[in-house]
């Protein structure tokens, strides 16, 4: 045993300039090293050769290695050996792994050991790396401090591997840079020659130290341009460790340590490393399992899940074997619910948390994004199971909305013409055992609330229990509770086409040989249950208000289905009249709710088939329904009381009234509906524009001013449509002058409401008013110039592309125009244009003519006072801008701009005492 107190006293007398805590003030490094070395030589009992021999024996270096280290050749080598021996002596005589009082050391002494270790790692590791490492800014400072010595580096590596076992040294990440330098040193030696000691050193760093730090350091090294041998070695280390346990998770963690890179970028980097064609199939399969385990672990962390899901998708795309493996793993997620091993009454198969976690995992895997998740066609076989789970979950649970998103993603990505109808047909017929078979809940399984009402349990029910699969109730309920209205419309059209086929198909079933009640029940179910489910589903969906708005955009498909149905009914008299009657009632509800469908060409083509159906059918209810439909198509229909109470129709009816106060009340209702984003109102955007333009012609100012407010609200829903319609109306030569002037006011109000977004439509707005300023109608021309002046101010004077044309219009009006109010407005435009000139030098050839014109107008006492006032304002603006320009020019002593690089060919003038801050240093 040695007296460790003397060694701590020795460390206290040294100054560690390269320790992490002292790097901010490391001037005089060479002097500090020399001073430290003298102190070590003074108090060391052993000669340096004996210290070296003792270290080589302890760390398993051969005699050849020892002989290749010459301490006398370099003072730095001597310093490395002596400092290493001091730390080795402390490590050997203090049991850092013991909690006994006699083995504990003070925090100050532990800090000395850490600083000495950091100093030693700088000289013994960082200063002896492969020359290519010094291309990196993190290592370049250590280049040329010492000539690299293979044996000395190997000795230092062995020393630090033993030192890193002491966990107290790792406090506050004190060994982070030591581990980085150690890994770089190991790789540098591996390039020169292989050694079992180096393999063990890398294995230790991977197994016992932070795996995330290992990957981070490897990626840090690879960021530098290295020689092929070194680059390949690092690449092999990266890929080799990646396929070891926890490799994928550690790689993601390493990239997430950088807060400046977003999660999507990190995910792309990870996926490009993980999903490579060069990996063996076995390695790819192991990686798939790793990634899935990672996703399960980080379910609640969306940022980290992004990397896992994207990597899994890239692995899925690599090979058919990977696809098969992923499909098998996905099936095992629900095997307990589809094919439970034990079916014992009351047995709990899955608790609340497990079920919610599995649903959340699938949401991440399939709904995280459009490109980074697994393909949605994998979900098709699980649709029955997912719909049953959705039906069993309480609506207030997050898992309910999550599983809803999964189902919606699957259905929405299916092709509408063939694929989606085929899926819906298989669901409603419940032919899930046909090839390819689909998965569903075991008939004995039931989802019930647990003792805690906010949680659920999946249990085995009584043997007489049958799992519910009422698609006519479950699927429409899911669709109408979501905001995915376009998908609701697709499903509605598919189901409508499906029921049309069911009505047209003659049933092959016969009642002649039914001999029992069970057979009768099966016959009735097979003949009528499917049609009943379809009608219930359609009835539930057609009552969904947003669906009608969507159907107005799919008029052609809807009416094509109905036309085929009517053609078949006119040929076949034995079709079920009750089903046809329900379909006709559905059509009437849709037509009553959408005027666009009533006016479509396809709807008018139905008239012939409806006439034929009405004359051939003996059913009075069908005849009455046909009569009502023909009335709607002919345009003689008036809204029913049920339709009138709908918010949009009520607002529209009020606007169409003759009394001003009723119109304004209807306008306010319409504005409120637009603010609430009412789906039925938004779907009638073009109709609202037409209604507003008609109301704008009202002579009552109370009405048309409120109508302008309606345009202001409407612009938030359909910007370009509103501006295009208003511009066309403003420039219409056939419209009344007062109406055109009001439209101009509406355009300005709409532009004000758009604010900065108005810049996107400046071409439409400016061209509209510039065209109007050429009108032969004096009042209209004056209005156009006034609107131009206000528009220039709204656009923050960003009218450079139109500047010359605007000046020509103003000049033409002032020289040839005879209407004084128009001239006033033209001078106002000129003043506003001067206000918008950011740099007068860009328009210097026009400044003198503008100045002379404004000066002449202001000086002419016979001129209109308002014109003189506008001209005076323009001159003030011009004077202010010219003064500012001249002042800035005087400050620079030249109107020419100069770019001067300070410090190059500068004459140091003694007069320049107050130098610029960039010239300091």
Swiss-Prot record:
Q: Where in the cell is it found?
A: Cytoplasm; Golgi apparatus
UniProt keywords, alphabetically? Cytoplasm, Golgi apparatus
Q: Which domain of life is it from?
A: Eukaryota
One GO BP: protein secretion
The record's listing under InterPro entries reads: ARM-type_fold, Rtp1_C1, Rtp1_C2, TANGO6/Rtp1
The residues that cross the membrane are none
GO (cellular component) term, any one: Golgi apparatus
Is Nuclease one of the keywords?
Answer: no
What Pfam families does the annotation carry?
Answer: RTP1_C1, RTP1_C2
Q: Does the keyword Zinc apply?
A: no
> Which family is it part of?
Belongs to the Tango6 family.
Physiological role: May be involved in protein secretion and Golgi organization.
Matching PANTHER family:
TRANSPORT AND GOLGI ORGANIZATION PROTEIN 6 FAMILY MEMBER, TRANSPORT AND GOLGI ORGANIZATION PROTEIN 6 HOMOLOG
The name this protein goes by in its record = Transport and Golgi organization protein 6
Q: Which organism is it from?
A: Drosophila melanogaster
